Amino acid sequence: MAQEKKAADHIKSTYRQVDLVFGTFAFSKLYEMLAEVLKEKKRVFNIEENASEIDEDFYQLRENKFSAFVPIMYGCNNFCTYCIVPYVRGRERSRTPQAVYDEVKKLVGEGYKEIMLLGQNVNSYSYGFPALLRKLNEIEGDFRLRFMSSHPKDAGSDLIDAILECDKVCKHLHLALQSGCDRVLKEMNRRYTAADYMKIVDYARGKKPDFSFSTDLIVGFPGESYEEFCETKEFIKKVKFDNIYSFVYSRRSGTKAAEMPDNISDKQKGLWLRELLLEQREVSEKWLSRFIGKKCRVLVDGKGKEEGMLTGKNDENIIVNFRGGEELIGNFADVAITNAMNWALKGELIG
């Protein structure tokens, strides 16, 4: 359940039939807690609000044998007004660099080709995220590193430098913008401006002109005007994102934004979202054309929709479709790009 002691106390006193309640910090102790409930007939309520230790032996289920998620930290300290995560996941706790290094090295030794480092805000990793990237880049093997999510207020030139210096780190940054309007960003408690965000983009593109960015956007935040929404539309054209993940604002009970008057109808939010997606479609179609005639290294993750086609993603996290044999699934393939759409690339297998 949510990492909230008050909620647990309410359940304990109100619902006598409930025998077990635990927060996200106690998940690794599930076996022991169940034993207490079943064998000792106890009611167990474990909400550790300030837990600092991380169980490094906790088993993680992997979906496939070539791409793996590796958490480097848990929780969040940012308290964006629309987000419930800090309340349900607790405060930030970081794994040690050595623990992360050992896990990644083990996965690479087992044949994994892609490692995705995870954190609600990897840039606030307490041991220094650029330093962690450089350390992991030293691991021998044919693999690539990705990470998410990044918060613009903590992302700077040191992060971009590490990405560009490390050959195993993908030259792509998913940097959640949420809005291109400064007033809305302030209401969201994001603690950066559109100009701050653009400085990061300009620095990266100054070093590597085709550096890839993707982002998250919220449409119809409480109090947002159409003119402010249009600032976001203009901003995505300015940045030239490869991809955006956009959502209409939805109220989350327990957040600051839930107390704000939501004066925008669901219908209006939907219309704005459609408008935003159409704008991004034009941006993507033009910007992705930069890959035509170039070679991409693609990690093949499965069959395509058409017979005989395969699909995967290049280092910039863009979908690439091409014709090839199923034996390539789970491996890297070099693909010559022949066509660009607004959401994917198409190419021909080299060799």
List each language-model region with its residue ranges:
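Conserved SAM/AdoMet-binding glycine-rich loop
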Residues: 2, 6, 108-226, 237
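Conserved, mostly hydrophobic/aromatic
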Residues: 80, 100, 117, 147, ...
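Radical SAM enzyme [4Fe-4S]-AdoMet core and its adjacent flexible, acidic
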Residues: 126-142, 188, 249-282
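Terminal RNA-binding accessory module
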Residues: 259-351
